[in-house]
Amino acid sequence: PRLYCFLDDRIQEARQEASSHSEYQRLIQNAANALKADLTAIGNPYSQINVIKRYVQSLYQAYYLTQQETYAKRLHELLQLLLNTPVSDAVLFADNFGSTNIAYCFLKPYDLLYKRLSSEERQSVENLLMRVLRFYYPQQQGTQENRIFDNHFWQQNLRVLFQATFLLYDNEALQDEVLPIMEYYYELWTARAPASGFNRDGMWANGTGYFNNNVYTLFYMPMLLSHITRKDFLLHPWYRNAGQALTFTCPPESRNIGFGDNSEKYTTSTYQYAAFADFLARETEDGYAGWYARQAAKTLVRDNDMRLYRMASNTLSYGTELPADCPK
C-alpha cells in the first residue's frame, strides 16, 4: 500500500503489539460495525456515501494493521457495491466534498487490495479517479494558488486529489497526464500550506471552529511528502509554533478564545485538537504539544482519523511537562 508508506518502518512492530494497544478495541469495534452492515439494504450507495466512507476507513485501518482476511473481504465487497452502481456526472460532481468522498471510497480499496483486484476492477477505479481529476484540476489550476483560502479544498479535497495522483502517477497509460497534476498539487502545498503560505505563528486564521476540519490533512500531507522527498516538511515555522498556539488559544478542558465560525460550540478541547497535539509531540518533540496531548488524553482516543498512525507509532514517546520557559 502506498497511502501510508510513511509508516512502512513502523508497521511490522505495530502489528505484533496491536492487540495490547489501548485503542485496539475501538479499532476492532469500528471494523465490526462495517462487517455487520447489511449491504443488501443499500440500494444506491452514493446516496449513503458518508456511511460507506466510514466503513471503508474502518476496514482499511483494521486490515492494514491486523492483516485479517475478513476485513479485506468486506472492503472488496464495498468496492464491488460501488462499481456495480454506475455514478453519473450529476451525482459525482454535485458538490466537491461529494466528489472527493466518492473518490476516497474508490482509492482506499484500490490501494490496499490492488493485487487481488481484477484488471476490470482496477480499470474501473482508475476511470473514476481520472474523471474526478479531469473535472477539478482545470478549475483549480491558476485559481487555488491565487485565492486566500478555499475551505473545502484545503480541508479535504487537495489531500484526496493528491492521493489519487499518487496511486496513478506510474500507470503507463496515465502517467503523462497524471504527473503534471501531481506536480501542481505538490507545488501548491509547498507554496500555500499549511496556512495560506504566509502564516508562521501556528494559529489557524480561519478560526478555531474550522481547525477541526483541517487537522487530518495537516497531519497527512507533511508526513507523506516528507517520506517521498526525504525532506522534513514539519520544519515549517507554522508547525513549530502550532503546539504553543493550541495551548494558549484552545486550552484542554476549557473554552477556546472564541475566534471564527462555530467557535462558540466548543466548551472544551476537541478530539481533533488532542490528536493533532499528539502527532506534533511524537514527530517534533514539541513540549507544548506533549503537555496538551497528556491533558486531553481521554478526549484523544475518540479520534478515528489518526488512530492507525498512533497505533503504528506507539514506540515514539514524548515529554508531557510544559516547557520551563512557558510564559505565565
Locate each region found by the language model.
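Extended polysaccharide-engagement surfaces of secreted carbohydrate-active enzymes
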Residues: N206, Y210-K328
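Aromatic-lined, polymer-binding surfaces characteristic
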Residues: L3-Y4, R15-E17, Y24-A32, K36-C250
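N-terminal carbohydrate-binding accessory modules
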Residues: P1-R2, F6-D9
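Extended, small/polar residue-biased N-terminal targeting/export presequences
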Residues: D9, E13-S19
